[in-house]
Curated annotation (Swiss-Prot):
One GO cellular component term noted in the UniProt record for this chain: cytosol
Protein name: 4-hydroxy-tetrahydrodipicolinate reductase
Organism: Listeria welshimeri serovar 6b (strain ATCC 35897 / DSM 20650 / CCUG 15529 / CIP 8149 / NCTC 11857 / SLCC 5334 / V8)
Pfam families noted in UniProt: DapB_C, DapB_N
GO MF annotations, alphabetized: 4-hydroxy-tetrahydrodipicolinate reductase; NAD binding; NADP binding; oxidoreductase activity, acting on CH or CH2 groups, NAD or NADP as acceptor
List of residues binding (S)-2,3,4,5-tetrahydrodipicolinate: H153, G162, T163
Active site, per annotation: H152, K156
NCBIfam families named in the record: dapB
Primary location group: cytoplasm
Recorded name of the encoding gene: dapB
UniProt: NAD(+) binding residues: G7, F8, K9, G10, R11, M12, G96, T97, T98, A122, P123, N124, F125
Length: 263
């Protein structure tokens, strides 16, 4: 299966390139960077034995390299337009870029179904993170008082994280609405109580040294429950990325969330 990587110079994109090279059934045919200094990936010491073209223009890459699937790890600013372009060219997409609105996801789903091609957008590709979200969804039925703390490296551009938003969405489906906190609480500093989704509070931490971490903290009379997942290295996401690439061959629609393709 021919694969191209968009955003290959980012930390996640770089790890995806190495993953595609390791997998026997996947072939790296192109990489994309918005301002490349190289014309071929072999100009990078780590990949000096390879012959893979570097593109600056997405449409040009799609037309010349003809990948079966594009993996996109870029930025929220261009994530939607990139995915739209990929699908409109009739190419499958695996997208780890976050920041999509529900309306954008539905628009992309319509394109995928019209073209009859598979695509997957996932806030998190770590299987452990998906299990955390599923456990939290189940717990929310019995513990409606809950807050989320998500922690990421300080270069992450969006807050709260896509994983935190997805977790809140899943819990809301299974949770009696409770507006967390005192009715007359006052923020002495704006934003002190975090963002709010369906009465739940979401707090974002950005610090150097972190990768991707999340706690879902439940409280009830006389007891508490904390569900936590930690990604210490970006390799934790790669099994999910490889699975998603292969899964797009079986799909004729866009799937949102890795949990929807796990058995």
């Amino acid at each position: 299966m021919k694969v191209a990587v968009s955003g290959f110079k980012g930390r996640m994109g770089h790890e995806v390139v190495k993953t595609v090279l390791r997998e026997e059934d996947l072939e790296l045919v192109a990489v994309l960077d918005h301002e490349p200094k190289e014309k071929n990936i072999r100009e990078i010491v780590e990949f000096s034995s390879l012959d893979v073209p570097v593109y600056a223009n997405l449409s040009e890459m799609l037309e010349e390299a003809k990948p079966d699937c594009v993996v996109d790890f870029t930025t929220p600013k261009v994530g939607y337009s990139n995915t739209k372009t990929i699908l409109e060219h009739g190419v499958r997409a695996v997208v780890g870029t976050t920041g999509f609105t529900p309306e954008q996801i539905e628009s992309l789903r319509e394109i995928a179904e019209t073209k009859k091609i598979g695509a997957l957008i996932a806030p998190n590709f770590a299987v452990g993170a998906v299990l955390m979200m599923q456990f939290a969804q189940k717990a929310a039925k019995y513990f409606p008082n809950v807050e989320i703390i998500e922690l990421h490296h300080d270069n992450k551009l969006d807050a709260p994280s896509g994983t935190a938003v997805k977790t809140a969405e899943m819990m809301a489906e299974n949770r009696t609405f409770v507006k967390q906190g005192a009715e007359d609480e006052v923020e002495l500093m704006e934003g002190a109580r975090g963002a709010e989704y369906e009465g739940m509070r979401i707090h974002s931490v950005r610090l150097p040294g972190l990768v991707a971490h999340q706690e879902v903290i439940f409280g009830a009379e006389g007891q508490g429950l904390t569900i936590r997942h930690d990604s210490y290295d970006r390799i934790s996401f790669m099994s999910g990325v490889a699975l998603s690439i292969r899964k797009t061959k079986e799909l004729e629609t866009l799937i949102y969330g890795l949990e929807n393709i796990l058995d």
